[in-house]
Amino acid sequence: KHPAKYIYRKPPALDDGWPTATLDEENIDRPAMERFIQRLIDVPQDSVNAPQHHAFLLVRHGKLVMEEYFHGYSRERLHDTRSASKSMTSVFVGAVMNDDWRLTLNSLVYQVMNGGSFPADLDPQKRTMTLEHLLTMSAGYYCDDTDDKAPGNEETMSDQTQEPDYYRYILNVPMATPPGEKSVYCSAVANLALGMAGAALHDFPLYAFDRLVAKPLRLGVYAWGLDPAGNPFGGGSVQYLPRDFIKFGQLLLDKGRWNGHQILSPEFATRSISPLYHLRKVTYGYLWWIEDLPYKKRTVRAFMALGAGGQLVMGIPELDLVIGLYAANYGTRTQGHLREVIPQFVLPAVREPGDDQNAPVIDQEYTNPYGASPDGSRVKP
């Protein structure tokens, strides 16, 4: 059987806060995008290594212009976001800061988590650890998720049974470097940022998330995982509906504002997606990845929420563009497949004012740079 020929249709306007438009109305080449979606449809599913795509959404100038689903997925079906959830944790922390003066980037982790005072005999390095260190993964814990020997490694933490409270678990992990010196990818640190926001409010984090983020963003149903002690896990695997998942990218693109609601301060939103540390051959802000992508004869800066398997929200402020992806490229499947096809096939279809509307769309060569961290150092101004 040959897959059916794809025909583009404008996304439906629903009661979820998204205005919709056509590709043509927002200056995106429709034939090029039709070829791109057909390319996704035509991927053979004859191997465990075959890329499998579940959803592709595209927003231009704040309007949803493309919404496509594959392999039985739909807009009504929740999807695991894996580590892309870390970026949503950052949004929650920023929303708490915007709502309550008691939490700042300089708030001291152990003071907040201990009810206002430091624990007795606390490691001097831990005494200086701040919320900003958690958001940039530069806390200094021995917790590298790629190091099986690290006691704060996510798998080590989730496999152990002695401490059901994951906030308390990471607080007791030894230090590897002073806070702020080096960024190391560590899910437990992102989770602790969520716990710190809840502790500052003296509230269960999910109640605060619902009030400060979910309601103003008009999120539908969503699902958070809990640790064995019943705390929400801020390091990954929150499930969102596709049209809700992509809202987080638009929120950051619009400097923390969504449909009249200032959920984040403009300063926090801007710094969240600024390159602060080198991490995995790209750069990192406040639990958001930052990378420069080829576009025409220059590069454009993109910020990204990334999750294993191909989960992605990408915003490109210079093009007023947001992209959302769900996929199942786990294990031996091509993890970075969709990240590569965006600069190859999607960005060339995006027009700017003054472009020749009849010019052919030329695919762009691109190789994903994502890989092992060379140093984890600060980005120099």
Segments the model singles out, each with a brief description of its role:
Residues 1-74, 98-103, 136, 349-381:
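N-terminal leader/targeting segments and the immediately adjacent pre-domain N-terminus
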Residues 90, 189-196, 236-258, 311-328:
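Active-site-proximal alpha-helical segments within enzyme catalytic domains
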Residues 227-241, 289-291:
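Carbohydrate-binding/catalytic loop surfaces
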Residues 219-222, 270-324:
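Active-site Gly/Thr loop motif
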Residues 108-114, 121-219, 242-256:
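Active-site-adjacent helix/loop patches that line small-molecule binding or acyl-intermediate pockets
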Residues 305-381:
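Structured C-terminal helix/loop/strand segments within mature extracytoplasmic catalytic/sensor domains
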Residues 70-74, 167-178, 223-233:
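Acidic/His metal-coordination segments adjacent to aromatic residues that form catalytic metal sites
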Residues 62, 80-106, 134, 193-197, ...:
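Active-site SXXK
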